[in-house]
Amino acid sequence: MTIILGIDPGSRVTGYGLIRQQGRQLTYVASGCIRTVVDDMPTRLKLIYAGVSEIITQFKPDFFAIEQVFMAKNPDSALKLGQARGVAIVAAVNQDLEVFEYAARQVKQTVVGTGAAEKAQVQHMVRSLLKLSANPQADAADALAIAITHCHLSQNVLRMSEGRLNLARGRLK
């Protein structure tokens, strides 16, 4: 049994989602958002670090997966996102977790089937895959999708290393 923590970083709202993987079975553990309502960036970063550290201490995940930075239209937004990612990653590394990073398009492709999926589609698929009674908050759903992506992609790598991955014309069968 493995617990995966997925993080959808943001300077104002950082989503988190935890799932349990047992073989191919995925089970919902917890999810939510770390909200930073203060204006100054150093305090926001401190709150994100403390929140992620607390989640890691409470749930003791085996793996930490986080969304990669994408090129935003506004360079200032991209820098703030990078800082939020940085403190979340430091929180994980300080507790000896290996960090895995996934691009947003890769997460959407894995969970929804298209890299151009809308947030509502991600929420719907996360709800369906984890058998939830309601759609999770958008940022929490993204974090759960990141954790799901880690499970699926790490399973494929494991199967490849064991020589059990079936490929036809370069695609998974």
From Swiss-Prot:
This is Crossover junction endodeoxyribonuclease RuvC. The RuvA-RuvB-RuvC complex processes Holliday junction (HJ) DNA during genetic recombination and DNA repair. Endonuclease that resolves HJ intermediates. Cleaves cruciform DNA by making single-stranded nicks across the HJ at symmetrical positions within the homologous arms, yielding a 5'-phosphate and a 3'-hydroxyl group; requires a central core of homology in the junction. The consensus cleavage sequence is 5'-(A/T)TT(C/G)-3'. Cleavage occurs on the 3'-side of the TT dinucleotide at the point of strand exchange. It comes from Serratia proteamaculans (strain 568). It is an enzyme of class 3 (hydrolase). PANTHER family: CROSSOVER JUNCTION ENDODEOXYRIBONUCLEASE RUVC. GO terms for molecular function: crossover junction DNA endonuclease activity; DNA binding; magnesium ion binding. Binds 2 Mg(2+) ion per subunit. It catalyses: Endonucleolytic cleavage at a junction such as a reciprocal single-stranded crossover between two homologous DNA duplexes (Holliday junction). Its cofactor is Mg(2+). Mg(2+) 1 binds at residues 8, 139. Belongs to the RuvC family. Keywords: Cytoplasm, DNA damage, DNA recombination, DNA repair, DNA-binding, Endonuclease, Hydrolase, Magnesium, Metal-binding, Nuclease. Homodimer which binds Holliday junction (HJ) DNA. The HJ becomes 2-fold symmetrical on binding to RuvC with unstacked arms; it has a different conformation from HJ DNA in complex with RuvA. In the full resolvosome a probable DNA-RuvA(4)-RuvB(12)-RuvC(2) complex forms which resolves the HJ. GO terms for biological process: DNA recombination; DNA repair. Its main location: cytoplasm. One of its GO terms (cellular component) is cytoplasm. It comes from the Bacteria. It is found in: Cytoplasm. The active site is at 8, 67, 139. Mg(2+) 2 binds at residue 67. Its EC number is 3.1.21.10.
